């Protein structure tokens, strides 16, 4: 006669409310339950789709125009998606036509600008489609109060982070902010990354950039991301640097932070 073997209580179960990570999924014998396996396969498919989704720069350009913002549509040196994925170096530079387009814009608009905002598909065009406009609405509203001048929003197809350095250099921008789709995770196919650089020029390494990651509804809010970015920009202008020598020390007071600031112990274990 078959006897049901009791399953021991999973001590990780209580932590599922604190993270979207795949923990405490349960088991069927030595395998995952069917529901957990199907969820994993669905999330993996979403991540793959996000990587290969085409960047709809035409729609984004029209939406920016409706909000009173001009834009320039450029292309990296990577000719297509396959080359972009196989040759990261080509995604860091503009193609010749785009370089000439920026040079012509700089000639007709001499004097440079304080800020160049660059938007690239990166590894998740889905993130750019979902979060660019809501974030810019929060960010530019606050940035305008500081009196910074901005170039048209630059949309780069098949672009990587460093392509913003070339854009900023050609436009004569004092600062660049890159909005780019981050590498999709199994719980975050639409995560937007922000990369800030002071005095951009071709050849800078990641050490000269500041990153604000996981901007999305389930991650870092648009308002919080804008607050942190503006702090970095103000400090960069004051100290004339960015990257590893510029730390994000922006103070953000929330109800949760005030309630937990005096607590001791490990919150995961229910201490304090």
Curated annotation (Swiss-Prot):
Q: Which InterPro entries match?
A: EutC (IPR009246), EutC_C (IPR042251), EutC_N (IPR042255)
Pathway per its UniProt entry is:
Amine and polyamine degradation; ethanolamine degradation
Similarity comment: family membership: Belongs to the EutC family.
Source organism, top-level taxon: Bacteria
Q: List the disulfide bonds.
A: none
Task: Show the HAMAP family listed in the entry.
Answer: EutC (MF_00601)
Cofactor names from the entry are:
adenosylcob(III)alamin
Question: Under the cellular component aspect of Gene Ontology, which terms does the record hold?
Answer: ethanolamine ammonia-lyase complex; ethanolamine degradation polyhedral organelle
Keyword hit for Lyase: yes
Class of enzymatic activity (EC top level):
lyase
What reaction(s) does this enzyme catalyze?
ethanolamine = acetaldehyde + NH4(+)
| Keyword Nucleotidyltransferase assigned | no
> Which Gene Ontology molecular function entries are recorded, alphabetically?
cobalamin binding; ethanolamine ammonia-lyase activity
The entry marks the following residues as binding adenosylcob(III)alamin, namely: 161, 182, 211
Q: What is the role of this chain?
A: Catalyzes the deamination of various vicinal amino-alcohols to oxo compounds. Allows this organism to utilize ethanolamine as the sole source of nitrogen and carbon in the presence of external vitamin B12.
Q: How does it assemble?
A: The basic unit is a heterodimer which dimerizes to form tetramers. The heterotetramers trimerize; 6 large subunits form a core ring with 6 small subunits projecting outwards.
Keywords attached to this Swiss-Prot or TrEMBL record, sorted alphabetically, are: Bacterial microcompartment, Cobalamin, Cobalt, Lyase
Q: Tell me which stretches of the chain form a coiled coil.
A: none
**EC number, UniProt record:** 4.3.1.7
Q: Specify the protein name.
A: Ethanolamine ammonia-lyase small subunit
As for subcellular location, the record says: Bacterial microcompartment
Any Gene Ontology biological process = amino acid metabolic process
Cofactor: how bound: Binds between the large and small subunits.
């Amino acid at each position: 006669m078959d006897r049901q073997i009791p399953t021991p209580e999973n001590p990780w179960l209580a932590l599922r409310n604190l993270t979207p990570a795949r923990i405490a999924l349960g088991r069927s014998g030595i395998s995952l339950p069917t529901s957990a396996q199907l969820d994993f396969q669905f999330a993996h498919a979403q991540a793959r789709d996000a990587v290969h989704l085409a960047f709809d720069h035409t729609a984004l350009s029209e939406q920016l125009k409706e909000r009173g913002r001009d834009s320039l549509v450029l292309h990296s040196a990577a000719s297509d998606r396959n080359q972009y994925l196989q040759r990261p170096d080509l995604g860091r530079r503009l193609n010749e036509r785009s370089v000439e387009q920026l040079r012509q814009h700089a000639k007709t608009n001499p004097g440079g600008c304080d800020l160049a905002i660059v938007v690239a598909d990166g590894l998740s065009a889905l993130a750019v489609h979902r979060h660019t406009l809501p974030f810019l609405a929060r960010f530019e509203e606050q940035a305008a109060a500081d009196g910074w001048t901005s170039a048209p929003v630059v949309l780069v197809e098949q672009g990587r982070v460093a392509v913003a350095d070339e854009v900023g250099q050609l436009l004569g921008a004092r600062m660049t902010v890159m909005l780019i789709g981050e590498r999709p995770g199994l719980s975050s196919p639409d995560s937007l990354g922000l990369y800030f650089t002071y005095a951009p020029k071709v050849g800078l390494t990641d050490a000269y950039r500041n990153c604000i990651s996981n901007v999305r509804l389930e991650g870092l809010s648009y308002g919080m991301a804008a607050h942190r970015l503006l702090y970095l920009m103000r400090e960069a202008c004051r100290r004339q640097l960015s990257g590893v020598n510029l730390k994000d020390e922006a103070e953000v007071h929330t109800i949760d932070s005030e309630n937990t600031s005096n607590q001791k112990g490990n919150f995961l274990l229910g201490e304090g």
